[in-house]
UniProtKB/Swiss-Prot annotation:
InterPro entries: Class_I_gatase-like, HchA, Prot/Nucl_acid_deglycase. One of its GO terms (biological process) is methylglyoxal catabolic process to D-lactate via S-lactoyl-glutathione. It is found in: Cytoplasm. HAMAP family: Deglycase_HchA. Zn(2+) binds at residues 86, 91, 123. Induction: By heat shock. Its main location: cytoplasm. The gene is hchA. Homodimer. The keyword Oxidoreductase does not apply. It is an enzyme of class 3 (hydrolase). GO terms for cellular component: cytoplasm. This is Protein/nucleic acid deglycase HchA. The lineage of its organism: Bacteria, Pseudomonadati, Pseudomonadota, Gammaproteobacteria, Enterobacterales.
Amino acid sequence: MTVQTSKNPQVDIAEDNAFFPSEYSLSQYTSPVSDLDGVDYPKPYRGKHKILVIAADERYLPTDNGKLFSTGNHPIETLLPLYHLHAAGFEFEVATISGLMTKFEYWAMPHKDEKVMPFFEQHKSLFRNPKKLADVVASLNADSEYAAIFVPGGHGALIGLPESQDVAAALQWAIKNDRFVISLCHGPAAFLALRHGDNPLNGYSICAFPDAADKQTPEIGYMPGHLTWYFGEELKKMGMNIINDDITGRVHKDRKVLTGDSPFAANALGKLAAQEMLAAYAG
């Protein structure tokens, strides 16, 4: 007999009217083991350049019916790219807008993954004790050691990052100083921070999570309601081209902006980023 899993969002008792994804959606879109592979970098980078991770610091995303989606950064989208980059020789630092700890979607953590989980435990303190982004931005100059800015996905990237002047300043610095910008899924929502000023990403092409898919997720209880706005629409208004309209694990390179469409792209994006950064900094 087939056991039917519920499509009702699960209550998050830590907050009023807040919900995790349904059992059904978790059964379809999460796994206890990731698809990490291809971590093979025989000549890793040995220098001082590193990655700046701009992480989410808020968990609760309001939906159109007033219910809150319990979110944060998606663990697969965060950890798999970083695993590849770390293996390629690039250390990383974590910053949030507030300087408060990173929020993760722990319901998507690959708890039985024998490579990813030790990596997370090894670096957990960076996520628990991040830098304040404004302090990082104040120190940026042409000689700064950050080789890339990485904005992980998860719906937590929709909260605060698109309105942050510090996010805008960090992205402007990266593009103007020929650094890499890496993101996937909902992470490119952070690019919206550029829409009210100098926008060096105008005309760039990226992969991102499709708005059409976000509009379908409440049907399976992934979110407890519909989003109140859609970041893809807004990115297009600011002159960006989203090249995918579905979720296939696709990645894309436009100059030094490297993007992926979903958690299914996390491993491939990690490979792409590691290869591109090694070519740029260890060649």
